Amino acid sequence: MRATRRRLGLVARNVGIPILSLVLVLVLWQLIVVGFHVASYVAPRPRAAIDAVTQNWSVLWPLVLGTIRETVYGFVVGAALGFFLGVIMAKVSFLQGLVYPVLVLSQAIPIIALAAPLVLILGFSTAPKIVIVAWIVFFPVTVNVIDGLSHVDRDLVNLAKVYGASRWRTFWQIEIPATSTPLFSGLKIGATYAVTGAIIGELAASDGSSLALYQEHANSNLNTAAVYGTTMVMTAIGISWFLLVVGVEVFATPWRRRTVARRWPWRRGRDLADR
């Protein structure tokens, strides 16, 4: 019974803290708009932005699904590419010295500048959006995998060799678990920017209907409430995707659940897993 109450209390704290933060942001928004007499065409009240979303949800929902689809596909492609490229570069030092500068150079290209040639090559379709998201995601994953594999405890690796473990078994049972912390750090960084990449892709390569173009249309019509409401929807997608990655980290690394719980994005203080 006591354990059940502790679990319920843990869930309540993990859910209640972010909800409280959201409420505080909305209250601050309301106070600024009302207190400084901000014109509605500059910044609407939170209720107006929320109403703009709920009243047009039948139109927004298909667009939201499209953005989520682009984010998921691009994230999966970028994460897989980043993981395998990171492993190869960590294992072959010559490739690391050869390819690493190219990777850094690739990230120096502004995403907006990258979008135009992608549209010329792939056309106005979902493909350029997926490529842009993957482009954003793969770099932090690659860098963190290289860093993780470069700092594996060599004593454990040598001990595995002494006991006759194959390279493949050593890789999966020692090196990959040891790399889980930097790997998921890279995935969480990628998750944070994945939705941004999808929105940029929609602005540059949309074939007529997308969440980004819906916001642009609202902006051109001076529908400020819809502009802010769409921004809230985009933010909700990004936060949800980040939390999903955190949840996967918790379940995929059972040996680190206590640490992951302690590093919960908005949690500070005592170890949640011990409460």
Regions found by a protein language model. Give the residues of each.
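Transmembrane alpha-helical segments of polytopic membrane transport and secretion proteins
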Residues: 1-21, 243-275
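Membrane-spanning helices that line or support transport/gating and their immediate boundary helices
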Residues: 31-34, 87, 94-101, 144, ...
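Generic hydrophobic transmembrane alpha-helix motif, especially the helices
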Residues: 104-140, 147-148
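Hydrophobic alpha-helical transmembrane segments of polytopic membrane proteins
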Residues: 211-249
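Short helix-to-coil transition segments within interhelical loops
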Residues: 149-155, 159-179, 220
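Transmembrane-helix boundary motif in ABC transporter permease subunits
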Residues: 73-103
